[in-house]
């Protein structure tokens, strides 16, 4: 069983794994950059912002 490209379903090329080509890798990157793909976060992500006292000792 060979792996298939998640963009076009062609066999994967090890040079571009997990994609079959640079084109499919670029299509995937553009989808991330345009906001088409997102990683869901919990509601508490905005309620607990990072501390502003990072450099404080």
From Swiss-Prot:
Zn(2+) binds at residues 5, 8, 20, 24. Binds 1 zinc ion. It comes from Caulobacter vibrioides (strain NA1000 / CB15N) (Caulobacter crescentus). Inhibits all the catalytic activities of DNA gyrase by preventing its interaction with DNA. Acts by binding directly to the C-terminal domain of GyrB, which probably disrupts DNA binding by the gyrase. HAMAP family: DNA_gyrase_inhibitor_YacG. PANTHER family: DNA GYRASE INHIBITOR YACG. Keywords: Metal-binding, Zinc. This is DNA gyrase inhibitor YacG. The keyword Transcription does not apply. InterPro entries: DNA_gyrase_inhibitor_YacG, Znf_NHR/GATA. Belongs to the DNA gyrase inhibitor YacG family. SUPFAM superfamilies: Glucocorticoid receptor-like (DNA-binding domain) (SSF57716). One of its GO terms (molecular function) is DNA topoisomerase type II (double strand cut, ATP-hydrolyzing) inhibitor activity. GO terms for biological process: regulation of DNA-templated transcription. Its cofactor is Zn(2+). Interacts with GyrB.
């Amino acid at each position: 069983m060979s792996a298939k490209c998640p963009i076009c379903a062609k066999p994967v090329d090890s040079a571009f794994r997990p994609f079959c080509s640079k084109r499919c890798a670029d299509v995937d990157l553009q989808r991330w950059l345009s906001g088409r793909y997102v990683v869901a976060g919990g509601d508490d992500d905005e309620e607990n912002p990072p501390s502003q006292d990072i450099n404080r000792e």
